[in-house]
Regions:
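Beta1-alpha1 glycine-rich phosphate/pyrophosphate-binding loop at the start
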Residues: 127-128, 132-134, 140, 145, ...
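A short, basic/flexible loop-to-alpha-helix module at the beginning of a structural domain
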Residues: 198-216, 342-352
């Protein structure tokens, strides 16, 4: 499982470990335990400071659970399952962060986490094919390392079906806090911090203030391609630049296949995001990641209040916050997010293997989702509001070749129906006749486009009713 090439890379990564680290594996019998034991032994072999210990530990839930111990003391980080696939990076980063490698968490966020003074037990349910899950696991692992009141456990849902059933989990990542659902589906570090501040409202006031940045020439909101480009261009002029991003990479990071970036015939969102980060690091740009701007105070010097409580003063503000998934806004949608309603086919598709699902939306995103899901699920029904699909012809032609994809056009989704806490059917209207119909199914993937991330600009600049920024013929907003 651990190839010679990976061992060589791990040897280099771990050469600066500053303390002994143990993988403490729970004793007992399990069909996957030998595989996990070999996996951990191979990793431990790359450095004398790493070791594998088998021990009966009350906090470990099964014989395929292990914890990281630093100097024979628990770090608060637990893995239940074999962290291979996308989660291998989560394990490696946990090892490195525990033994001295600097964390990438913003200093303001670190101060908030250090201020937690009550026990917080996080459980993160993942699938090893989920490309969003590692970000959540890695963030919570860092929380645990920063504060001994916090524990973080990654749980591979594929190896714990009884827990998936018990907790009614139908999408990943799903995060439980002290046994209750804390966050699911569209989760990132900024969301975790925001929800944690809701859970403990006085965290920001208890936290030690982060070091104040000097006056910035340019501050950019948004970490997608547009925001990164703006920051780089400004930095090349010798200006003092800060980039604020809830999630570096933006929507691009969640895109698995990119084939329309001229000069790059094919790439993936994570690869492109990594290249953007490398490019940004070539310049003197301050990156404030996993933070939200909660308030903008106008004036010659603009003041931005961040979710950490930090205030950034800037001469110029560039907003490149992009867009987010558009919601249906029908009864049953929000109530069933994570219980049958999803927005990411790559993340949640595996949970519907052999089941019937719907995709709402007949544009490129919807048809691509249907194509991806058709290789996993029993059947896919695509519902399109308009009389014709708006997806590119090449995608429509591919879809026509799949026997398990059905298309319903001119259909308006009316509500999502659930039984026993799980999605059981969709209700829609045939727009031509007005007839209301229902179709039994197990999951619904919403792919109906995007809405602007412009909430923070309300009252700052003029917006359209849809949240778009109004500009004049010179590209100027209503605010100087």
């Amino acid at each position: 499982m651990i190839t010679p090439e990976i061992k060589q890379a791990l040897t280099q990564y771990t050469q600066n470990m500053n303390a002994p680290l143990s993988f403490v594996l729970q004793v007992g019998e399990h069909e996957k335990r030998d595989e996990l034991k070999t996996f951990l032994s191979d990793i431990a072999s790359v450095n004398d400071k790493l070791s594998l210990v088998e021990r009966d530990v009350a906090e470990l839930r099964s014989p395929i659970s292990f914890a990281l111990y630093l100097n024979d003391e628990p770090t608060g980080i637990i893995f239940s399952g074999i962290p291979s696939g996308h989660e291998f990076n989560s394990l490696v980063l946990a090892m490195l962060h525990a033994t001295g490698t600097d964390m990438k968490l913003d200093s303001g966020i670190q101060q908030i986490i250090k201020a937690v003074d009550s026990p917080l037990q996080f459980e993160v349910y993942v699938s090893l094919s989920c490309h969003n899950c590692p970000d959540v696991v890695q963030a919570l692992n860092q929380f645990a390392l920063l504060n001994s009141n916090i524990t973080s456990e990654m749980i591979d849902g594929g190896l714990y079906p009884e827990l998936i059933e018990q907790n009614n989990i139908q999408g990943v990542p799903t995060v439980l806090l002290n046994g209750q659902v804390f966050a699911n589906d569209k989760v990132d570090t900024a969301t975790l911090v925001s929800k944690l501040q809701e859970f403990e409202p006085d965290l920001a006031s208890k936290a030690q203030p982060a070091e104040q940045l000097p006056l910035q020439d340019v501050t950019v909101l948004g970490g997608g391609p547009a925001g990164v480009a703006a920051a780089i261009y400004a930095a090349r002029k010798g200006l003092a630049v800060t980039l604020i991003a809830e999630k570096f990479g933006g929507q691009v990071k969640e895109t698995m296949g990119i084939e329309n970036l001229i000069s790059v015939s094919s790439t993936t969102g994570p690869k492109l995001t990594g290249a953007m980060m490398e490019h940004l690091n070539d310049y003197d740009v301050t990156l404030k990641e996993h933070l939200r701007v909660t308030q903008i105070e106008q004036g010659d010097i603009k003041k931005l209040t961040l979710s950490s409580g930090e205030i950034i003063e800037t001469k110029t503000l560039i907003v490149a916050t992009g867009a987010n998934w558009r919601e249906l806004n029908v009864p049953g949608e929000k109530e069933n997010i994570g219980n049958g309603v999803a927005y990411c086919p790559h993340c949640d598709g595996p949970f519907y293997k052999g089941k019937d699902v719907a995709v709402i939306g007949g544009g490129n995103s919807g048809v691509e989702a249907a194509l991806d899901l058709s290789g996993i699920v029993k059947s896919v029904t695509v519902y399109e509001f308009l009389p014709e699909l708006k997806a590119d012809r090449v995608l429509v032609d591919q879809m026509a070749k799949r026997d398990n994809i059905t298309v319903v056009k001119n259909a308006a989704t009316k509500q999502v129906l659930a039984t026993n806490g799980k999605v059981s059917a969709i209700e829609y209207e045939e727009r031509e006749t007005g007839e209301i119909k229902q179709q039994a199914l197990d999951g619904i993937f919403v792919q109906i486009g995007l809405v602007p991330n412009s909430q923070v600009l309300k009252g700052v600049v003029e917006l359209t009713p849809y949240g778009e920024v109004v500009i004049n013929e010179k590209g100027e907003t209503s605010a100087p």
